[in-house]
Each structure stands twice: as C-alpha cells, then as structure tokens.
Regions:
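Beta1/beta-strand and adjacent pyrophosphate-binding region of the FAD-binding site
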Residues: 2-15, 31
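Core beta-strand elements of the Rossmann-like FAD/NAD(P) dinucleotide-binding domain
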Residues: 3-5, 210-220
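Active-site substrate-recognition segment that forms the wall
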Residues: 21-25, 49, 75, 83-91, ...
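Glycine-rich FAD pyrophosphate-binding loop
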Residues: 25-44
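Dinucleotide-binding Rossmann-like beta1-alpha1 core, especially the glycine-rich loop
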Residues: 48-146, 280-282
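Flavin (FAD/FMN) cofactor-binding and adjacent substrate-gating region
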Residues: 100-185, 190-191, 197-204
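C-terminal lid/capping helical subdomain adjacent to the catalytic/cofactor pocket in oxidative enzymes
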Residues: 120, 362-436
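FAD-binding beta-loop-beta segment adjacent to the flavin cofactor pocket
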Residues: 133-135, 142-151, 336-379
Length: 436
C-alpha cells in the first residue's frame, strides 16, 4: 500500500517532534515515524534537560539563548490549550566551575555579543553563594581508585554563573507537548514501526518503506532518528561527503539524595545546576530533595561507544554510578554515595566535535537533524524552526552548500548562520565533552 504526504520525519524525540510541529505549521502534510510507542521514548527520556548557554561557538550561544525564550513561554510556543499538562522550565541558574581548557572568556566573549547576562565569581564569592560546595581545584579528573583522587586541592576555584539558566523538569513530557502541538496542526504519527528502505529516483528521495510494507511517498524526508540516525543514513546512501563522523555513545545519569540544606541558598529557590569539568561531572537539582549526577567525559574515563544503539543497557552500572557520584561527593562533601545505583542510561548520537548536523545531504530532499551529542535538548524548540528555514530555502532552489542560509530568531532577533551546523564544516570549536 502506498500513501502520499509532503514530508516524512523519522524519529519522534524532542528534536523530531519540534521539526514536525514547525513543518506542519508551515502548511505541509507531515507524517512522523518512530520505533517506540510514543514521543520522547528514546534518548530524550534519559536527558538531564539542562538549559545553559555555555557553548564555545557563537551559533551555539545564540541558539540556546533563543530557545530559553521558548521554554519560558512554553504554552504560547505550543499554542496549547489551557488544560494541557506541560513540561516546566525551572530557572535556578547554571554555575560553571573554572577549568583552564575552557576558561570563562571562551563563553563570555559570545555572551557579550548576544546579550546573555552573567556573573564571574572568585573563590570567596563562590563559597559564599554556594556554601555546600568545596571550591578546591583538583584538575585533572582522575579515576576514583587513583591514589591522587583524594589529594589536597592545588588552588581554589571561581565560577561563571548564568542566572537565566536552569532545566526542564520533564523532558519526555516536553517531547509529547511538541508532538501534540504538531498533531493539532495536522501531523500524524506512526508508532512502533521502523523504516526498512529509503526510496529514491533520479538522485532524489521519493519516500520511505515501513516494516509492514507500507510505502510513504514524500518529496522530503528528515532524519531525526537520534542514535539510530547512522543506520537510516546508510539506508539512504548518504554520508559520503560528511566531514564529521557520528557514533552512538551510551551514557548514564544518576539519582541521589541531596545533602541536607543543599538547596537552602535562595529562599524557595533551588541550588543552581553545577557544571564541574575540574572533577568531570555535573550536578542538577531534582526537586528539593534529590540530585541528578552526570559526567563530562574526562580523558581518564573509557567511553562506551556502540556499534548498535539497541545494545545499550537502559540500567545504570555500579562502576559508573560509583565513579560519578564519588566525584560529586568530592565537590559536595555532605553528599553520601549509596551502595545501590539508581538512575537512567541512554544513548547519545555524538559527532566528532560534539556539535549537531542540521543540513541537507547529497540525496536531494533528504535532510538530517542528527549528531545532537547529548547537548541539544535545550535547543529543540528552535531546531524545528532552523530545519524549516533550511528545507524551505533548499527546496525553493537555494544552494545552501555554496551560500549558507541564515535563520533570524523570533524572540531575540539574532541571526544564526546555518553553515555552523553543516555536514561539510571544519570541526567546530569544542570542549571535547557533552558541553559542546
């Protein structure tokens, strides 16, 4: 059986659902295909959903700053009815501890241009603002079994604080909100089905074939399949001209009780998200009683690259839990390290430079929103608009490879050069971590 539509979006995570919404808003007929049973059931469900602006590229900072304005007015962004439960943005701030390989100036030079407010704290102010935090400098990160792990601090740390940062409380609900908004604009979703073939004719995509045999005829196909994006690219026969590689990477985020009084730093407010590349971890509030603890890929840690993202266990391991939570306890001396791991694991779709690819491909009509590298949840509201600008421009005849398109942001008015996310780019400036 053959069905016809304008666009097929493969993947209904927070990125794919945003793309579906914006393309449907533009008047196109959109069908979304996803292997799971609902929006945000893949990598999105394991996201820490941190909203921060500390990217080493100007395009990254502009995208995150614009996206903040979408999260702050989430119901308006979605045009959601009054009774619909929505994910909520928690403005608790983000505090980035000093580290030599990513100095404050790497970010503040962009903040000054874009208009992102920030504060630079010395060690004394950091201690006064966050008294539960050990301000010692311990760089470089070490395995927790290393004899030097508990060595005395070599100096004291300051920090870069962005008061407008924070996190979204329910990343999966955010994806479902976007999917529901897309459906209100006419998009349809096919759950629990996979693409088995990308159909093409004369150098142009003409649709996809689903596992039950249905063919979806479409002039545009968007790959937003997360860690499964490489498999879909291979089905489409694209990727030969990419200058950045992509690989699935399994990651864990752990759940622990917060130290007593940790959140008592601002009345009813929570403590900020703490990004600690000095020890190789980050710490995010989870309500007022708990914390989420993740890693920042320090060089001393082996990374769990996967050939097949389906091979990644969704359960946290004792070894990673012990490593990450012990590092967090070094920074927060009041934190206890439980014996039993608790948390989630997911698979990132990681590029060589930890920067996403939002681009066309050598197959006309086949577009990619991939390589999100664990740091693009925050930008999801904008990515749908970036991809709509890209698709409308290229399908209208613009040669994006020769002259990159520009997207003008609705809220901030900032122009974003889409060439920054090109598949053919030179490797972007990067910390070499999930921070981008």
């Amino acid at each position: 059986m053959t069905e016809s539509t304008d666009v097929v979006v493969v993947g209904a995570g927070v990125i794919g659902s945003s793309i579906a919404l914006e393309l449907a808003r533009s008047g196109l007929r959109v069908v979304v295909v996803d292997k799971f049973g609902g929006a945000g059931n893949g990598s999105t469900s394991a996201s820490s959903a941190v909203v921060r602006f500390t990217y080493p590229t100007i395009a990254g900072v502009k995208a995150a700053w614009e996206s903040l304005h979408c999260w702050e007015a989430w119901r308006d962004h979605l045009q959601a009815p009054a009774g619909e439960p929505l994910a909520a943005f928690n403005r608790c701030g983000v505090t980035l501890l000093d580290v030599d390989f990513a100095p404050c100036s790497l970010f503040t030079r962009h903040f000054d241009k874009v208009g992102v407010p920030y504060e630079e704290w010395d060690a004394q102010e950091l201690s006064e603002r966050l008294p539960a935090v050990d301000t010692g400098r311990y760089f470089p990160p070490r395995p927790v079994d290393d004899d030097e792990f508990f060595a005395d601090a070599s100096a004291r740390l300051g920090a870069l604080h962005t008061p407008d940062g924070g996190f979204v409380d329910d990343p999966q609900l955010a994806a479902r909100n976007l999917a529901a908004a897309a459906q209100r604009h006419g998009a349809t979703f096919r759950w629990k089905t996979e693409v088995t073939a990308v159909m093409r004719r004369g150098g142009r995509v003409r649709g996809v074939r689903l596992e039950e045999g249905t063919e979806l005829s479409a002039g545009v196909v968007v790959n937003s399949a997360g860690p499964w994006s490489g498999q879909l690219n291979r089905l489409a026969g694209v990727g030969g001209d990419f200058t950045v590689g992509l690989r699935p990477l399994r990651q864990e985020v752990h759940h622990v009780a917060a130290p007593a009084g940790y959140h008592d730093v601002g009345g009813d407010r929570q403590a900020p998200v703490l990004v600690d590349m000095d020890l190789g971890t980050y710490i995010r509030p989870e309500g007022r009683e708990f914390l989420l603890v993740g890693g920042t890929e320090p060089e001393c840690d082996p990374l769990e690259w996967l050939d097949d993202p389906d091979d990644g266990s969704p359960l946290p391991t004792v070894s990673q839990f012990r490593t990450q939570v012990t590092r967090a306890a070094r920074r927060l001396p009041g934190l206890r390290v439980p014996n039993k791991p608790k948390g989630v694991a997911g698979v990132y779709d990681v590029t060589d430079d930890w920067t996403p690819v939002y681009d066309r491909t050598e197959l006309a009509g086949f577009y990619v929103a991939i390589g999100t590298s664990g740091n693009q949840f925050k930008n999801a509201p904008l990515v749908g608009r970036l991809m709509t600008t890209l698709i409308q421009g290229v399908e209208g005849g613009h040669d994006h490879d020769r002259s990159a398109l520009t997207h003008t942001c609705e809220h901030t008015g900032q122009p974003i050069d889409l060439g920054a996310f090109s598949r053919r780019r030179r490797p972007a400036a990067s910390t070499g971590t999930v921070l981008g």
